[in-house]
């Protein structure tokens, strides 16, 4: 585990899911045109918010880049800058991901830290190692120290 200040993000909604089961993508035409235009290249993170009983998937972009590129998304969600406890998890093969690893982490840290926001994950890598397809996610849990 490590602790870091995670910058502010703007999020563009993609879909709901539970584990590796996802609903249909729901990105608006306006947001799709901004993100995937021929005039600019926009770098976004594939981000998930671990809400009660479900996951919501988003494209996330640091606030500073949105300001620099003068982008304006429709119906975006804002995540403020936060102190987060972070770790990496292996999401496994496609079809194997569930939130059990997150629940284990939350149980492990509950005596030391107060969770002050919605835990989230960012897919930081995916690819094959030998014959196994791996997806690596950075887990970010907004925290405050318990007194």
Q: Language-model segments: what does each one mean?
A:
Residues 1-147:
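A solvent-exposed interaction/effector surface
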């Amino acid at each position: 585990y490590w602790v870091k200040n995670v910058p502010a993000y703007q999020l563009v909604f993609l879909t709901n899911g539970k584990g590796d089961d996802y609903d249909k993508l729901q990105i608006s035409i306006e947001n799709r045109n901004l993100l995937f235009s021929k005039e600019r290249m926009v770098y976004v993170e594939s981000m998930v918010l671990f809400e009660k009983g479900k996951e919501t998937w988003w494209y996330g972009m640091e606030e500073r880049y949105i300001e620099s590129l003068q982008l304006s998304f429709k119906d975006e969600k804002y995540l403020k800058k936060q102190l987060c406890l972070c770790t990496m998890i292996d999401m496994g093969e496609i079809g194997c991901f569930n939130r059990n690893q997150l629940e284990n982490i939350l149980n492990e840290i509950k005596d030391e830290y107060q969770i002050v926001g919605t835990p989230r994950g960012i897919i930081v890598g995916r690819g094959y190692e030998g014959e196994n397809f791996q997806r690596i996610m950075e887990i970010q849990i907004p925290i405050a120290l318990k007194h």
